């Protein structure tokens, strides 16, 4: 049996409303992930305890995760790609299997042309081929289509500044 994904799987749903304080905390941490709660509190004019409590709630609600983001190319991973997977039957077992692999950094079940979409980060093209062959060998996989990344043009992690207006609370 494969290990379960690090975070729980679930449908894409609308989480609780975020207010201006939540948004300010998210934006501060996106700018400087190591910013202290005291400094954030001073910037936005609230108590440090409030920042600490709001941060804990944002993390518990899986809205916020502060982590070090690396550049795979800088770490020696020279082959990245997206793999579209079609399955016979339920896509969940296939997605769960792949989500347990270290090469898979993003796995989603989708509606549309593919049942599962997987982003892979591999050492080189030979390794990417080995991993795509492992995907093809999973029970229930009918077909795959691999999209090899040629050049990274944009990768951002600043969604906090883009909270949809209808999601904001007063």
Q: Predicted regions span which residues?
A:
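A compositional/biophysical signature of low hydrophobicity enriched in polar/charged and small residues
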Residues: 1-170
